[in-house]
Amino acid sequence: MVAPRGKRAIVIGAGIGGLAAAAALAGHFDDVTIIERDAIPADVAARPGTPQSNHPHGLLVGGQRALCELFPGIDQDLANAGAAPLRGGIDIREELPGFDPCFPHRDLGWVGYAMSRPLIELVVRRRVSGLPNVELRDRCRVTAIEAASDGSVAGVRCETNVGTAMTLQADLVIDASGRGTPALDFLKATGRPQPEQTSIGVDINYATTTFAVPNGERDWKLVITVPEMPESTRTGYLMPIEGDRWMVLISERHVEPSSPDLKDFLDLVRRLRTPTIFDAIKNAKPLDRIHRFGFPESLWRHYERLVDLPRGLLVLGDAMCRFNPVYGQGMTIAAQEASLLKDLLQERNAAKDSLDGLERAFYIRALPSVAAAWSLSAAPDFIDPRTRGERPADLEDSLRFRAGLLRLAAADSDVHKLYLGVRNLIEPTSKLRDPDLVRRIQAEMADAQ
């Protein structure tokens, strides 16, 4: 057992990032307190603080593995709770332009899981509740992070839903609030600059509903229908979730939000680039109303660039970098950040002051994963000329390289596995720059001209 190195740590937010962070801290502090403004449901249910819960959430294989490092055996917990197993390369039908009817099906040797956001939160929360020194206080809102006289973190001020105010002391505070405003407010209150920001304005609007899975044989469990951008931005997702249900989503960019009824929703599905999803659901029983959600921009707050990092404050998950949800990276990066935090604390266990310099070490360690996920989504986002933000100078070359990589992956199973490994954040993007692979991709690019 690792000896605790601090008396109390406080985590703001009980989403996936906050729960995973609490598990990472549990072996290094006497007490860990999670503070959550929402009332925490006892079962599988959405909560007000996560309005996106009614829409598909992807836990990439990299995120699943990070959670397994924090909670050994949690993949089996997810399966026991009803999550749908997905064999990599076999059970997902990817309908990409130029690869009709779909990208080749191959067994890539790993299994992921599909489930609703409320289910994965419930399963992770139950594992956290089994940690004896972790407490979850719901219906409690952090009003401020408290500063010590030297500008370091001293604790938090919070208020319950009935107006009871209190101050909790802490050696370490983690802002996993999603919005990230407690940390930003603390920086301002202590006279520190705000982190630089990079944003990509995508203006995505979602419409999602749920269907009972009808009888029938299919050679897929999950479908992704990608449009021919920029002519169209209408993307379709059909994802299996617990309870023998399909969650079906339509996303569009730069369109006015609307509140479609089922007839309008089905019409949007019918107008996808391929008929696969429409044919699957046209006679299926709808189980829910249509839910809407808007996502204006991806936002990366560059805490790694701050010179004056306050001792005792870490920011992770969406509070540090909010990714375009179309690519399913958010929960995975949050889990990976929590896992590397656990590794950092273990590495520092023998140090006289294991928390000294932890902040900079954490941001430096997290940077490659965050940067990789950001770069994987940035190039395809900028295919749409209406996307706001600074376009990479090498955008056209990157898009041509990506197209060549896809053609090579369709023909070569090893490249296919590497490509999906990078997308699932289990392989570094640097592997795509292997000289031999680059030469083969460049040959594909030349053939396409």
Where are these regions (language model features)?
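N-terminal Rossmann-like FAD-binding beta1-loop-alpha1 element of flavoenzymes
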Residues: 4-35
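N-terminal FAD cofactor-binding segment of flavoenzymes
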Residues: 24, 44-94
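Residues in the short beta-alpha loop(s) of Rossmann-like NAD(P)-binding domains
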Residues: 38
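Short beta-strand to alpha-helix junction loop
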Residues: 58-59, 107-126, 176, 182, ...
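Helix-loop-beta segment of a Rossmann-like dinucleotide-binding subdomain
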Residues: 97-117, 155, 250-253
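FAD/FMN-dependent oxidoreductases across multiple families
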Residues: 114, 244, 256-361, 365-369
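Predominantly flavin-linked oxidoreductase catalytic cores and closely associated redox partners
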Residues: 130-268
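C-terminal helical "tail/cap" subdomain of flavin- and related membrane-associated enzymes
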Residues: 342-449
